[in-house]
Amino acid sequence: MFEADYARTELAVTTPGTDMVCQRGWYSSTDFWSPELFDMYVVPQLRKLTALAHKHRRKFAYVMTTGVEMLGPRLADAGVDVLYFVDPVLDKLSCRKAAELFGDRMTIVGGLNSNTLVEYNNQKIRDEVREAMDVLGPTNRFILHPVDSLFPDVPWESVACMIDAWKDYQ
């Protein structure tokens, strides 16, 4: 399996216009791996992938939604530049804790659970955007993003509210 990941990464980093390679680690979380097994089997392969990306002056991103508090520092140590998706609800990882752990080591994508948008409570959406921006914004390594995506049941008004709250923060 690693050979396929390496070949895919190599193709991506040698393709003109590629800025970043993203490895989806949906099955590389503490839901499936103990920290010891993660260190033994995932980290060494990940180091090779990040080294390949960096050799070609590309960024390397990794997707992980649970177990981030425990495994995230290992991702940073392995050379990951961007961590998708820091989820304050699903993973119970507050923006403050994420900033402490990774704020100076990796760009963090997330900070807002998409379920917040389903409820369409303007004040709650604005409060959560402000919290994420207050805490993670100063790191200059933060991309506000509803984790893990916008689903069909999310009212557009909620998305507009999130965007407006972000704009108001600027």
Model segments located where?
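Active-site loop segments of alpha/beta catalytic cores
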Residues: 1-170
